[in-house]
Amino acid sequence: MDSVKTPPPRLIAGDFEHAMLRIPSRSIGMVLTDPPYGIAYKTGMRKDRHHRFCREIEGDRDLSALERAAPEMMRVLMPDSAACVFMAQETLAQAERIMRSAGFEVVNRIVWDKGAHTMGDLTHAFGKRYEVLLYCAKGRPRIRGRRWPDVWRFPRVPQNRLQHQNEKPVELLERAVESLSDPGDMVLDPFMGSGSTGEACARCGRAFMGCEIDPYYYGVAEARLMG
């Protein structure tokens, strides 16, 4: 972990659009985010409708949230910096079009290999074992440290430790942060969920700014990062 002293995380409750309008242009060192995938995701593992994971993710009916966020990502990012966006297989092509329309170059489709496939439709489809992290460039970012291949193998967060139904392992996020930003840089997550990106930034010596519209998950992130 880097020894650079960073300011406390800046957490914003509410819609990312209002928050990002207040961010100065060319002030963010990296965007790393896991936006709504546009697949109306609900976990099939939960039978109790009152369980915290038995809820639709805000804005997950389509990719309109990413469509609104992408131009603002381009505006607030410093020259020669990266936006890394997680996306589902089903909506990957559409997400790439959105990022390109905002002015980004899609450099890599980084495959996150979870090590075990999901259940899903047992008679019609093969088990899904990966998600994609789109590495998108504003200008020409440089890769710091090791040049990793484009398949990253990290196990999923164990079910008994999940704080969000689509939570990403912090170690996976650390690799992205360390590879595409410098110590002390401000990393932005417009859809921070339970705050995993913020934890990765704290471990890596990066400043963090995150937005979350869902009051429940904002509270989870606040307790995780500010507690």
Functional labels for PLM-detected ranges:
Residues 90, 226-227:
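Class I S-adenosyl-L-methionine-dependent methyltransferase module
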Residues 1-219:
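Core catalytic lobe of class I
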Residues 220-224:
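Short functional hotspots where side chains directly engage DNA or cofactors
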